[in-house]
Regions:
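Catalytic Zn2+-binding segment of zinc metalloproteases
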Residues: 102-117, 132, 136-137
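Hydrophobic helix-coil surface modules that form long, contiguous segments used
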Residues: 1-99, 128-131, 140, 161-165
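Active-site rim elements
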Residues: 22-30, 115-116, 176-183
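Acidic/His/Gly-enriched intrinsically disordered linker/tail segments
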Residues: 123-191, 195
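Alpha-helical packing segments of well-folded alpha/beta enzyme cores
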Residues: 34-39, 98, 102, 106, ...
Length: 199
């Protein structure tokens, strides 16, 4: 656990949690440290203090989503609690995921899309901002190299499949929503933001 002092002076309690059986492997201090690096970055970028009273990260088993934001609390697949020595690429991916979910506190939770048609905007922007935050606030200053060789490449591969779709897809029902949580919505959408900023 830890805390962060917001730009508006509030003390924001932070927690990082996992199953008791994983505690010997859990580097919760590093999770909190990455989060503390991202908080002031997002408060400055969004020109808005952290909008909730606390921030918890709960590492959970058998979680299909990978990670999911909720106001003041994020759930993350406990594969990110490393049981053996991880590659630095995996440690970097965890940092990006932590900062992706933190970005959603402002863009996704404080401000929420009206309907799932704008899923792409929610996820693409969080993916883009998490790489900006990683590159500018953490030791992974080459996060965009990783993005271009990983997420962007994955999106390009998915875009060549018969199941490709526009970044801004028409969402009629829950099934449409679920099939759009993919590399096109995340990686291709973030690539478009990257291009717009560079332009």
């Amino acid at each position: 656990t830890g805390s962060y002092t917001s730009v508006d002076g509030r003390n924001i309690p932070m927690g990082a949690y996992c199953r008791r059986s994983l505690l010997p492997y859990f580097d919760g201090d590093e999770v909190i440290n990455i989060t503390k690096q991202g908080m002031p970055f997002y408060e400055t970028q969004y020109k808005q203090p952290y909008p909730f009273r606390k921030y918890d990260q709960i590492f959970v088993p058998e979680y299909n989503m990978g990670a999911m934001e909720h106001p003041g609390c994020v759930t993350i697949l406990d594969d990110y609690v490393f049981r053996s020595k991880p590659t630095q690429a995996l440690v970097e991916r965890r940092a990006i995921t932590i900062l992706h979910e933190l970005a959603h506190m402002w863009f996704g939770d404080l401000v929420t899309m009206k309907w799932w048609n704008d899923l792409w905007l929610n996820e693409s922007f969080a993916e883009y901002m998490s790489h900006v935050a990683t590159a500018e606030t953490t030791r992974w200053t080459d996060a965009w190299v990783t993005f271009n060789s990983s997420e962007k490449l994955h999106a390009q591969r998915q875009d060549q499949l018969p199941s490709t779709h526009p970044i801004a897809a028409v969402i009629n029902d829950l099934e449409d929503t679920m099939v759009n949580f993919d590399g096109i919505t995340y990686g291709k959408g973030a690539s478009v933001f990257q291009q717009l900023v560079a332009y």
